[in-house]
A protein has these predicted regions:
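Basic, Lys/Arg-enriched alpha-helical interface segments
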Residues: 1-85, 95-97, 105-135
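ATP-dependent carboxylate-activation loops
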Residues: 101
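Short, surface-exposed beta-strand/loop micro-motifs that present aromatic residues
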Residues: 88-91
Length: 135
């Protein structure tokens, strides 16, 4: 079962899908759920949750046509959302869908190469499994 946010009436131009590992885990979905649960009693979690969900909505409504402080192209077709110190990797998939891959908390000026490589591996896994379903 793929977790997906569908575009509303005329409001959203794009759909958002959450990458899931073969075991069904979704890093971004699980992180958002964790923040949502903590938000009732933790101000930092509440702020992070609001920021990340706002940035996902901006992506859903506007795609990648946004300032670098909101979304940034990393390499190939890997992009990142940039809410606060959090980063959420994603890529564009067919039918106006963006697939959210994984998140990490940024601690250095430059995005760590291992995070980029993980995003590429997740993208490739997603595409491989989608192609297998089509056949």
């Amino acid at each position: 079962m793929e977790r997906m946010k569908q575009p509303g009436e005329e409001k959203n131009m794009y759909s958002i899908a959450f990458y899931e590992k073969e075991n069904g885990e979704s890093d971004v979905w699980d992180f958002l759920e964790e923040l949502r649960e903590k938000a009732a009693t933790n101000k930092d979690a509440r702020i992070q949750y609001r920021q990340i969900t706002l940035y996902i909505e901006l992506l859903q409504n506007n795609g990648t046509r946004q300032p670098d402080n909101i979304t940034k192209h990393i390499e190939e077709n890997i992009w990142e959302l940039r809410p606060g110190n959090n980063r959420v990797f994603y890529f564009y998939y067919e039918n106006n869908t963006f697939v959210l891959l994984h998140h990490f908390r940024k601690k250095t000026q430059k995005t760590p190469q291992r995070e980029i490589e993980q995003a590429k591996a997740e993208r490739n896994d997603y595409l491989r499994r989608k192609e297998a379903v089509k056949k």
